[in-house]
Design a protein with these regions (language model features):
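A conserved mid-protein helix/loop that constitutes part of the nucleotide-sugar donor-binding site
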Residues: 26-33, 192, 199-215, 233
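Glycosyltransferase donor-sugar binding loop
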Residues: 46-52, 175, 197, 219-236, ...
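Short His-centered aromatic/hydrophobic patch
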Residues: 88-93, 111
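Membrane-proximal helix-turn-helix segments that form the acceptor-binding/catalytic region
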Residues: 127-146
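Carbohydrate-associated surface elements
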Residues: 152, 174
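Aromatic "clamp/platform" in nucleotide-sugar-dependent glycosyltransferases that forms part
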Residues: 274
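Short hydrophobic beta-strand element within catalytic cores of glycosyltransferases
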Residues: 291-294
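Conserved acidic donor-binding segment of nucleotide-sugar-dependent glycosyltransferases
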Residues: 308-317, 324-331
Length: 367
């Protein structure tokens, strides 16, 4: 175990597998925001779940302090650390949680996603993934409190496990943003440069997005890592068959300044997800003043309340019609929609999120 200003005792101890610059998705963004506003009674363990890492760059963490790094093989050391509440973010951490570790201490499971198939199969929501189901159920049963990141995810969880209803709390994710947001006005000159940023996963709806612009005079710019090689191959085969090589462009994974430049180059950001438990990508687009064209499934509908350019991802031509509406609307209509996005963003500040979690800690400790 490698410690960076790690104290002898913490009231709250978060275990995570995404932190600093070691990010994959929304759970990592969440963790960095929790770290940004954490108090001195809160510690963090970055759990390395892959191969051993020989070197650790302290600059990967936003500040120096209250961080320990360990490999999953060392997780038994959690039993000897002094903490009151353990907070886990991922069902794979079920392997770390047992009586020896817990010792009658409190456990909170922050459910960033109920790990079902999409669409969810009736009678088999986990699609036969028994290992995933068992780990998820184990943590849910063991936890004193379950936190869902949207009302949609709460309802999804209760639909599968009604017995958990009384111990579920909802805390929407949050992000840190400038109070003054400048509208991206690329759409005044062009409404044909669209972008997608995120993982390559069938649930993200990338293929459906490409299919939707096939008959529209538009480009799609994709910023993504290579998470699923078979899905990428399927996408590439469609692009070739549809003769869209000059209109669909891959930029690789974009972070930092590259991400900023990528988002600023777009006329609108498309979020074609079949389902999103929350939807951090929407908040990021809103931070840059971008018009969004988004599915309305899951937490996205809560983020984009009252917004025009939303669609049902399972409706025929839903995304295509939303794109066409964006292209045909007046500049003043789009400005009005950007105003709605700016107002909605104010509901999701990370500092507010952090304060809501503090209320949960007090509830657990003081009853």
């Amino acid at each position: 175990m490698f410690k960076i200003g790690f104290k002898e005792h913490y009231r709250i101890l978060h275990i995570n597998n995404e932190m600093g610059n070691r990010l994959v998705g929304g759970a990592g963004t969440y963790m960095n925001e929790i770290y940004r506003y954490h108090k001195s009674d809160t510690g963090f363990i970055y759990m390395n779940m892959g191969g051993y890492l020989d070197d650790f760059d302290m600059e990967e963490y936003r500040e120096t302090g209250d961080v320990a790094i360990m490999h999953m093989d060392e997780s038994s050391k959690l039993a000897n650390l002094d903490w009151d509440i353990l907070v886990v973010q991922f069902y794979e951490f079920a392997n770390c949680i047992n009586d020896m570790v817990m010792q009658d201490r409190k456990l909170v499971y922050v459910i960033h996603s109920v790990p079902t198939t999409e669409p969810m199969l009736a009678g088999d929501p986990f699609g036969g993934n028994e290992g995933v189901r068992q780990k998820f159920e184990y943590l849910c049963n063991r936890a004193d409190i379950l936190v869902c990141v949207s009302n949609a995810e709460r309802e999804k969880l209760i639909g599968i496990y009604p017995q958990y209803k009384d111990k579920i709390r909802v805390v929407h994710n949050g992000i840190t943003f400038d109070e003054e947001i400048t509208n991206n006005e690329n759409y005044r000159k062009s409404r044909r440069v669209f972008g997608y940023i995120g993982r390559t996963d069938y649930r993200k709806g990338i293929l459906e997005c490409i299919q939707s612009i096939k008959d529209i005079d538009a480009e799609l710019h994709i910023a993504c890592p290579k998470n699923d090689s078979s899905y990428i191959e399927k996408i590439l085969l469609y692009i070739e068959a549809a003769n869209m090589q000059d209109r669909v462009k891959f930029h690789g994974w974009c972070v930092g300044e590259r991400k900023k430049n990528f988002l600023n180059s777009l006329d609108a950001l498309i979020i074609p997800s079949l389902y999103e438990p929350f939807g951090y990508v929407a908040l990021e687009g809103m931070m840059y003043g971008l018009p969004l064209i988004s599915s309305n499934n899951g937490g996205l509908d809560e983020i984009l309340e009252g917004y025009r350019y939303k669609y049902d991802p399972y409706s025929k031509d839903g995304l295509k019609n939303a794109i066409l509406a964006f292209r045909q609307d007046s500049n003043s209509e789009i400005e009005q929609q950007q105003k709605i996005l700016r107002e909605n963003l104010k509901k999701f500040h990370a500092k507010d999120m952090s304060e809501k979690y503090c209320l949960i800690w007090e509830e657990l400790i003081n009853g």
